[in-house]
């Protein structure tokens, strides 16, 4: 079978509330995920009669045993009745440590694409169960629908959000998720609320104040973006975003971004580009960009 390209889209947390800390150290959260039509691309060339996995280009400083793409492929290999491998090529667009799901999205795309290409036959639920072993955000990418998430992020309720465009800025810093959740200054007492109340209320990110204090670059980006539209941080950062009604308005602000800052404009999607690609493959047997 020839190589096939699959999208690994970005996500935004439109709000992120930390409701408490569990005895096992994980945090109880409430958050709202939406996908963007912008992200990495992964090309898979299936191999038969071998369990060889190769990834190019290698990600500097990330050995295979820590790479989520390789780890996802190996989890799926363990469920196969016969040896299958793959050459994988990564077109990296999303920043690491940005809070827009780069590594989690790559892992989910690997699970979904190789499940199809290897004809593994795992259900969406089974793929999501593999995904949560790699990270709390992986299941939402596997399921491919905008969602309200609770627990540690594993309880997902699909939602339909209004069409919107987003300007995303990536400050010049890397924020480690584990460090944020381990910080004693992180607020952990936001009361849990029903989804309909959350959708009608003011959206916030409980990690934002802490990250702004630890990373002035994030504070600077938010301060600049707030001059043009209500803005928040996504996930544990470092990316920040603002919502606009149309692409033109978002691009007008992007054109004013200070020199040296990275940013992009993307449309919010209730259905992940990965899910759309899977449907296309199922219907026509091909994946197109």
Swiss-Prot record:
Record carries keyword Membrane: no
Similarity comment text for this entry: Belongs to the GHMP kinase family. IspE subfamily.
Catalytic activity from the UniProt record: 4-CDP-2-C-methyl-D-erythritol + ATP = 4-CDP-2-C-methyl-D-erythritol 2-phosphate + ADP + H(+)
Protein name: 4-diphosphocytidyl-2-C-methyl-D-erythritol kinase
Residues annotated as catalytic: 11, 137
Swiss-Prot/TrEMBL GO biological process terms: isopentenyl diphosphate biosynthetic process, methylerythritol 4-phosphate pathway; terpenoid biosynthetic process
Keyword annotations: ATP-binding, Isoprene biosynthesis, Kinase, Nucleotide-binding, Transferase
Source organism, top-level taxon: Bacteria
Species of provenance: Aeromonas hydrophila subsp. hydrophila (strain ATCC 7966 / DSM 30187 / BCRC 13018 / CCUG 14551 / JCM 1027 / KCTC 2358 / NCIMB 9240 / NCTC 8049)
Pathway it works in: Isoprenoid biosynthesis; isopentenyl diphosphate biosynthesis via DXP pathway; isopentenyl diphosphate from 1-deoxy-D-xylulose 5-phosphate: step 3/6
Residues annotated as binding ATP: 95-105
Molecular function terms, GO-annotated: 4-(cytidine 5'-diphospho)-2-C-methyl-D-erythritol kinase activity; ATP binding
UniProt function note: Catalyzes the phosphorylation of the position 2 hydroxy group of 4-diphosphocytidyl-2C-methyl-D-erythritol.
EC number in record: 2.7.1.148
């Amino acid at each position: 079978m020839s190589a096939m390209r699959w999208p690994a889209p970005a996500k935004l947390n439109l709000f992120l509330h930390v409701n408490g800390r569990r005895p096992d150290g994980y945090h109880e959260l409430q958050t709202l995920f939406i996908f963007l039509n912008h992200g990495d691309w992964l090309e898979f060339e299936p191999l038969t009669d071998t369990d060889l996995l190769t990834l190019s280009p290698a990600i500097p400083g990330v050995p295979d045993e820590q790479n989520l793409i390789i780890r996802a492929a190996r989890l799926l290999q363990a469920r196969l009745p016969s040896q299958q491998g793959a050459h994988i090529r990564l077109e990296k667009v999303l920043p690491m440590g940005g809070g827009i799901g780069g590594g989690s999205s790559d892992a989910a795309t690997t699970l979904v694409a190789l499940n199809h290409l290897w004809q593994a036959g795992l259900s969406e639920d089974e793929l999501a169960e593999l995904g949560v072993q790699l990270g709390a955000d992986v299941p939402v990418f596997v399921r491919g629908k905008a969602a309200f998430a609770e627990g540690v992020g594993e309880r997902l309720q699909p939602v339909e959000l209004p069409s919107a465009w987003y300007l995303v800025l990536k400050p010049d810093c890397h924020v480690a998720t584990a460090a944020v959740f381990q910080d004693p200054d992180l607020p952990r007492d936001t009361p849990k609320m029903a989804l309909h109340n959350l959708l009608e209320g003011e959206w916030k990110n409980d990690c934002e104040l802490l990250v702004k204090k630890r990373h002035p670059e994030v504070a600077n980006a938010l301060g600049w973006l707030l001059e043009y539209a209500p803005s928040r941080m996504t996930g544990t950062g470092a990316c920040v975003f603002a919502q606009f009604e149309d692409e033109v308005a978002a691009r007008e602000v992007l054109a004013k971004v200070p020199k040296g800052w990275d940013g992009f404009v993307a449309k919010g999607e209730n259905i992940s580009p990965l899910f759309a690609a899977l449907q296309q493959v199922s219907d026509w047997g091909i994946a197109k960009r």
